[in-house]
Amino acid sequence: MALSNIERHYNKHPEDKRLLRRHGIVEFETTMFYIHKYLKPNDYILDVGAGTGRYTSALTAEGFKVKAVELVQRNIDVFLKRDPDADVVKGDARDMYMIPDNVADVTILLGPLYHLIGDEEKVKSLLEAKRVTKPGGLIF
């Protein structure tokens, strides 16, 4: 199977340190602030486009059950090397066939929304996020 533009990008520009740099720290802290504003104890979180697992690992360390979905195998390898017990699967935000309907209380879809090109691709990922998120659940 041919690599997507996203996979080629992350094979060339590693994701693992981005959220640890100055601008990335601001992004991470701001995002976590808003996620925490709406999380409830025992929420099941789906982190779609999880990259190397920065959000997944942080939320898991706080006691939340988190499943990560990531497109780029290199990112998954880095993620699992750092956190071998992580619940991560290879998948595409536009077609998460491996995730059942209505399972997540919260779905995080940040990366796919700014990496996918064109409204049609973004709408596909939003529809998938809606499908896997419980009625009344939240999508970030």
Task: Report the location of each language-model feature.
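A short SAM/SAH-binding and catalytic strip from SAM-dependent methyltransferases
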Residues: 106-120
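Class I SAM-dependent methyltransferase SAM/SAH-binding core
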Residues: 54-95
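Conserved class I S-adenosyl-L-methionine
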Residues: 1-40, 42-49, 54
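A short glycine-rich, Lys/Arg-flanked "PGG" loop and its adjoining helix->strand segment in the class I
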Residues: 123-135
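Structural signature of beta-strand start/N-cap positions in the alpha/beta core
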Residues: 44, 65, 87, 103-105
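A short acidic, Gly/Pro-enriched loop at the edge of an enzyme's catalytic core
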Residues: 97-107
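Conserved beta-strand signature within the Rossmann-like core of class I S-adenosyl-L-methionine
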Residues: 136-140
